[in-house]
């Protein structure tokens, strides 16, 4: 029967030559395990627009990161301390405990690093195109560094009529703050309102909990303009979580990150003189850079935190700071030996070196999460839908890298796109990797051909950019703007 067909997420070649990265002298013959779709007659090359030779320094480039960096206000930390004893078990159950705890830490940003890495971003593939290969922020990174769940219902799902009553209560509070001295539901006004008002019954405690999660979502997870207020569009999500329903926050947050990186890349290419405001929280991108590029890490994180029992992975980067010159950063980003493919170690799902399916996956949230890490799909955000391409960065997830195939774009409703993400654990099969990942000879040859083919166009584009990159009427710039458009459902 058709409904019994298993979807296999991993392709296997029982005997193939695998290279250790781009070092052609380190080869081995073994079984190769690849994420699908891969190894087709017409592989999907990276976007040529992603390798435009953008100048190393752009003094006139105006980018504001302030809105995307919430810090961790003292009042917020007080609220976490107040509610954690009461709700920690519930947060653990729906998968947000690490995310809430991580929000109590301050993470400093290095704007030079963020701008430099954005220059390598490809909006077409949602990956960074480095000279040595592709890499990206994955769902695993959002789970490990952001503490956000990949499992649960879609963030666009509406609550039931019973739950809707709590949404209405939050709207009333928001209206009250609009009429107060604050004039709007600012973060400080919101938290003070609930810290000063002690709940006297279960309903009051429930509304405070929903208000708390609404602020957490607005500040740290699904931030949208205006950036200094609690957003009413997160009320539906917050109240559903209060009622014990898990929500898939990681794909929503990752979709927003991809969207804003694509917008920032277009801004950089055009050398736009107007100020560009980054709204999506970039904390996780900064942490991703520190995890993946050891030479760009703050030294204090290695020595000061050694041996400490930290509450979350992200906490090792709390309050540390570094400032590097743009040329130093670019050199590190372009070096194939400077990138750590698996900084978190091997997957924690167990069953290494074996195939899993059916009941094994149904019984394990870890296996269900891992399946979403490795499966090409769509990320449904609050206001955008983005492609997710783990098969292009398979080594980050422990798999060998072959030539990636095109993942088809489905122009459909968000519900249909969500069905691609929301897999049925009974109907999937995949392999849990147990060896150091490498690349195939075909991939190395294909990548070299891509790099060679782009060298000529890079030189030509560089000349165009030098002649007048700031002019939006320049025909070369027009071509690049077209190349970097993002498809959004």
Predicted features and spans:
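Extended, charge-rich alpha-helical regions
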Residues: 12-15, 23, 183-187, 191, ...
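Nucleic-acid-interacting cores, centered on viral/eukaryotic replication and modification enzymes
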Residues: 108, 124, 128-153, 193, ...
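Acidic-enriched, low-complexity/disordered segments with a strong bias for Aspartate over Glutamate
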Residues: 3, 41-44, 60, 66, ...
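Amphipathic alpha-helical surface "interface" segments used
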Residues: 163-171, 238, 279-284, 469
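Short amphipathic alpha-helical leader/targeting segments
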Residues: 156-157, 161, 271, 302, ...
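N-terminal leader regions that mediate targeting or early regulatory function
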Residues: 1-229, 233, 247-255, 388, ...
């Amino acid at each position: 029967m058709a409904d019994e067909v298993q979807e296999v997420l991993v392709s296997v070649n029982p005997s193939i030559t695998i290279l250790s990265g781009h070092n052609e002298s380190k080869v081995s013959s073994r079984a190769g395990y690849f994420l699908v779709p891969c190894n087709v007659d017409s592989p999907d090359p990276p976007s040529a627009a992603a390798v435009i030779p953008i100048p190393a320094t752009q003094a006139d480039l105006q980018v504001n990161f302030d809105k995307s960096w919430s810090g961790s206000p003292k009042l917020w930390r007080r609220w976490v301390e107040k509610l954690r004893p009461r709700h920690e078990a519930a947060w653990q159950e729906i998968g947000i405990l690490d995310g809430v705890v991580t929000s109590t830490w301050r993470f400093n940003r290095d704007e030079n690093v963020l701008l430099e890495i954005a220059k390598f971003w490809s909006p077409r593939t949602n990956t960074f195109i480095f000279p040595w290969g592709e890499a990206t922020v994955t769902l695993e990174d959002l789970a490990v560094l952001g503490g956000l769940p990949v499992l649960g219902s879609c963030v666009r799902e509406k609550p039931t009529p019973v739950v809707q009553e709590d949404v209405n209560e939050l709207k009333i509070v928001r209206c009250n703050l609009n009429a107060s001295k604050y004039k709007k539901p600012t973060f400080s006004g919101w938290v003070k309102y609930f810290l000063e008002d002690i709940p006297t019954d279960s309903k009051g405690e429930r509304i405070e909990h929903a208000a708390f999660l609404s602020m957490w979502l607005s500040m740290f997870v699904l931030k949208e303009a205006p950036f200094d207020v609690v957003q009413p569009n997160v009320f539906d999500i917050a109240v559903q979580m209060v009622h014990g329903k898990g929500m898939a926050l990681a794909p929503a947050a990752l979709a927003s990150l991809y969207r804003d990186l694509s917008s920032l890349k277009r801004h950089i290419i055009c050398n736009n003189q107007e100020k560009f405001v980054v709204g999506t929280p970039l904390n996780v991108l900064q942490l991703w850079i520190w995890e993946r590029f050891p030479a760009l890490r703050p030294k204090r994180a290695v020595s000061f935190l050694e041996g400490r029992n930290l509450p979350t992975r992200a906490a090792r980067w709390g309050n540390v700071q570094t400032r590097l010159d743009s040329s130093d950063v670019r050199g590190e980003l372009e070096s194939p030996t400077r990138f750590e493919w698996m900084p978190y170690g091997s997957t924690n799902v167990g069953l290494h070196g074996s195939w899993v399916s059916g009941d094994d996956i149904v019984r394990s949230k870890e296996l269900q999460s891992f399946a979403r890490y490795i499966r090409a799909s769509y990320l449904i955000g609050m206001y955008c839908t983005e492609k997710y391409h783990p098969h292009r960065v398979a080594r980050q997830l422990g798999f060998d890298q072959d030539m990636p195939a095109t993942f088809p774009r489905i122009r459909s409703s968000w519900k249909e796109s969500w069905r691609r993400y929301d897999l049925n654990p009974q109907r999937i099969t995949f392999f849990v990797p147990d060896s150091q990942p490498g690349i195939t000879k075909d991939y190395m040859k294909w990548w070299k051909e891509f790099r060679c083919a782009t060298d000529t166009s890079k030189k030509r584009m560089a000349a165009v950019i030098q002649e007048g990159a700031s002019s939006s009427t320049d025909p070369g710039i027009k071509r690049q703007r077209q190349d970097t458009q993002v498809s959004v459902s």
